[in-house]
């Protein structure tokens, strides 16, 4: 459960991203594919090479979904319900990949925004991404 401080930290960091969300999403996906080769089995139809159009496109989708989540912190399940259905029933993404991508997102954000990435912000973002991952995997059962 995100505390009021966590919510404030998430909103503060998200407001600093500016128009770079898609870029950071693609960078995080690239990090995940390089660091965890087993994640390359999904999406099997993607060109997972660095800078590919598919990685950039999916990076934008990731960033947009996280922006939606960051603006609906009090109702993540409602805000992400359709996305949860998509990942569980159609795409069938391995649930472990959400945790791996979350870590890669944290690394990417820390690299680009070191001043904003305080220990408190790091902890809050980690909780936020874990909450998003939990919602996205909730319909796998």
From Swiss-Prot:
GO cellular component: a single term: hemoglobin complex
Binding site for O2: 58
Tissue: Red blood cells.
Domain of life: Eukaryota
PTM-bearing positions, type Phosphotyrosine: 24
Keywords per UniProt: Acetylation, Heme, Iron, Metal-binding, Oxygen transport, Phosphoprotein, Transport
Residues bound to heme b: 87
Residue list for modification N6-succinyllysine: 7, 11, 16, 40
Domain Globin: 1-141
One of the record's GO molecular function terms: organic acid binding
PTM sites of type N6-acetyllysine: 16
Listed GO biological process terms: hydrogen peroxide catabolic process
Post-translational modification Phosphothreonine, affected residues: 108, 134, 137
Cited function: Involved in oxygen transport from the lung to the various peripheral tissues.
Family according to the record: Belongs to the globin family.
Name the record gives this protein: Hemoglobin subunit alpha
Species for this entry: Peromyscus crinitus
